[in-house]
């Protein structure tokens, strides 16, 4: 199988398209995986336990672990790698942070991340360093019925510390949404442990691109530098605008990190297997072409 890197590296590629090995099970991952498997038909508890999920330092409002998976890039002999134009390959692989389940009632935003984790062992994906938070709002997902907000009734995607938060977040909520409780931004930015956890992961990991999964608008949204993606699979670019306290505003506008928001077409029913694959392949193609690490480390 051919290996594709920026400008199609014309050197021997040592990355194998193999499944990643099963990792040690953290004790907290056992109950976490069981709970997800009971809620989502697409998640198998036994497979989930083998992913090597680790709890973060913070917990959700209701005390549930906030789980993360770290998948470093496969090692390569950097001295042998050059692009077709003769340029050396950046020595630090691009870092990609995937975030699912910010809104607990968008079930497919969690399910598709688990599907994509099955493909991280393939050659193309192994060129990159991945950090994956498949479920950022466990209290919302595991509520009966599932809800958009977290355990405090806060919309986590309006709770990030954007520079305009104090001036605009609460007025926007009151005037533009009619104080819709599903879109309450909180009393202050980062009031919620889930938001603080994601913020800390971004600061620690220093991603070159953030991919946030939502539903059900069936589009792509984009904030930040780099050439915007035009299409992933059947999802076409349709920029939704910038909201006070949103992840796209915080990451893409304030932190200057490319933020892709993938809006799946249905919050409860997964895209077809073919469409899941097309979104993934087009995302990797865009990353390969447009995302280069800002610094070497």
Describe every region a protein language model picked out:
Residues 2-10:
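Bacterial N-terminal signal peptides that target proteins for export
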Residues 19-21:
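N-terminal signal peptide c-region/cleavage motif recognized by signal peptidases
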Residues 24-69:
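Short glycine- and acidic-rich boundary segments immediately preceding or forming the N-terminal edge
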Residues 55, 68, 132, 210, ...:
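Conserved beta-strand scaffold positions in the cores of enzyme catalytic domains, especially
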Residues 68-92:
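Short beta-strand-to-loop junctions in surface cap/lid or active-site-entrance loops
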Residues 83, 92-93, 97, 106-239:
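Active-site/substrate-binding loop(s) of hydrolase catalytic cores
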Residues 219-223, 231-232, 244-297:
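Active-site-adjacent mobile loop/cap segments within catalytic or ligand-binding domains
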